């Protein structure tokens, strides 16, 4: 099965030149990705990877990038965090239709990760809700890769905080 996802990185000063890095990425198995170097100090890889599972696809890509660009720090795996417009696009409806749906189903719709001027949700939770509702076309591959991207991002954030902070957050 093919899985589509993007990995975004902050480059270290040891990343080397762009041509050298592109060669290392290809040698390490990232030849199934479109590479973006438009922002100085950043690297984005948009993969379409063949694998038995989304977990295998993303894990193999993460390992390949780690080998090719050892000092790079993962910023984000996508698709994960989405706003109303992104959700609407994924399920094939208008932004206004999505806003109304979220409002009408405010009790059962997944809670946002961030609520403010622009709210953000985990795509995996939203797709699972749509799948449970029925009547909406949800790609199983998209749901699977969104779940894996969410897990990668949560793990990355947990690794950033101290054990004491984790204990405090989970106490109770």
For every predicted segment, state its role.
Residues 125-172:
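A short, Lys/Arg-enriched interface patch at domain edges and termini
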Residues 78-101:
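Polyanion-binding surface elements
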Residues 17-42:
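A short, structured beta-strand/loop element
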Residues 32-38, 63-80:
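Conserved short beta-strand edge segments in small beta-sheet-based binding/regulatory domains
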Residues 1-13, 82:
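Short glycine-/aliphatic-rich beta-strand segments at the starts of folded cytosolic domains
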Residues 9-13, 45-52:
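Short beta-strand-to-loop capping motifs
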Residues 13-20, 53-58:
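Short, conserved charged micro-motifs
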Residues 93-119:
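Major-groove DNA-recognition helix of helix-turn-helix-type DNA-binding domains
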